[in-house]
Curated annotation (Swiss-Prot):
GO terms for cellular component: plasma membrane. This is S-adenosylmethionine uptake transporter. Residues 21-141, 160-280 form the EamA domain. The lineage of its organism: Bacteria, Pseudomonadati, Pseudomonadota, Alphaproteobacteria, Rickettsiales. The chain crosses the membrane at residues 4-24, 39-59, 74-91, 98-118, 121-141, 148-168, 177-197, 207-227, 237-257, 260-280. It is a multi-pass membrane protein. The keyword Repeat applies. It comes from Rickettsia felis (strain ATCC VR-1525 / URRWXCal2). Transports S-adenosylmethionine. GO terms for biological process: amino acid transport.
């Protein structure tokens, strides 16, 4: 095995670990969401996340927390609060695989928001593919059927929140340290969550607290896995593997919750996946042309 192939496989391995962690997050969130209110889950998740990040803050020094954009951190925290509470609640009423397929639609929302907030010019082919992707989202959510539950739209609200986070990250992350982005967002989300969570408070058991700690730690763990992966392979090289998360989620949901993806979820995935892949690769080409022209 040559060095290039070894580096590629190692990078993909790190990326797959991020997918496993992401699926585990959804499974834990679903389990906890059936026992605790989503506001309380959000509070503990980001409270523990801020605790886990403290050693990194001490290691890198207090200068890593210096920021000239406190409003950005507050906005990220509010979006995280809204997105995570909506996502957790959605998981309590829909299968994990449905959540996974909806998460594939986030690049579609990001593309649309980028037009308004980043002044990006989008070629007509990407608009067509975006429309196709949203058709896949509609197929997944089944609003045209008798058994449609409107509360499943909380997933869509969460996806829009996460897309807004992507926009903010694209605009500001290069101007702020990663530690400060993570730490301040966790603090803000925990602070915002606490007053609302106190209205629905149920004291978690020892096992639930342990799961909440793991849930709070895993966000940083996923980021670590992704950074390791992207240090070895290009982000577009990992794109096809992103959709293995559906397989991982389906296996976990089957054994833990006895869930199995329905036909609508699978049909929606078949439509959304090619659409988002096209967007990812076309964005890569656009960035390459931009760099070549500079």
């Amino acid at each position: 095995m040559n060095d290039a192939l070894k580096t590629y496989l190692t990078g993909i391995g790190w990326f797959l670990l991020s997918l496993v962690s992401s699926s585990a997050n959804d499974v834990m969130s679903k389990y906890l969401g059936t026992r605790l209110h989503s506001f309380e889950v959000a509070f503990f998740r980001f409270f523990f996340s801020s605790i886990v990040l403290l050693p990194f803050v001490f290691y890198h020094g207090k200068n890593t927390l210096k920021t000239s954009r406190p409003f950005v951190h507050i906005l990220r925290g509010l979006l995280l609060f809204f997105g995570m509470t909506s996502w957790t609640y959605g998981l309590t009423i829909a299968p994990v695989t449905t959540a996974t397929v909806v998460s594939f639609s986030i690049p579609l929302f990001t593309l649309i928001l980028a037009v308004f907030f980043l002044n990006e010019n989008i070629i007509w082919q990407r608009w067509v593919v975006t429309v196709v992707g949203f058709i896949g989202l509609v197929v997944t959510l089944k609003p045209h059927t008798e058994d449609f539950n409107p509360e499943i739209l909380y997933f869509v609200l969460a996806a829009i929140s996460f897309a807004m986070l992507d926009i903010i990250n694209k605009k500001f992350v290069i101007k702020e340290s990663m530690i400060s982005m993570l730490f301040y967002s966790a603090i803000v989300t925990a602070v915002v969550s606490l007053p609302v969570a106190s209205q629905y408070w149920l004291t978690p058991s020892g096992f639930e607290l342990a799961l909440l700690f793991v849930l709070g730690s895993s966000g940083s763990l996923i980021l670590f896995f992704l950074l390791k992966a992207f240090s070895m392979v290009d982000a577009t090289a990992t794109a096809p593997y992103r959709y293995l998360e559906l397989v991982i989620s389906a296996i976990a949901a089957y054994f833990i919750f006895s869930e199995f993806p329905d036909k609508s979820t699978l049909h929606g995935a078949v439509i959304i996946i090619p659409a988002t892949l096209f967007i990812i690769y076309s964005e890569k080409k656009a960035m390459s042309r931009k760099h070549e022209s500079q």
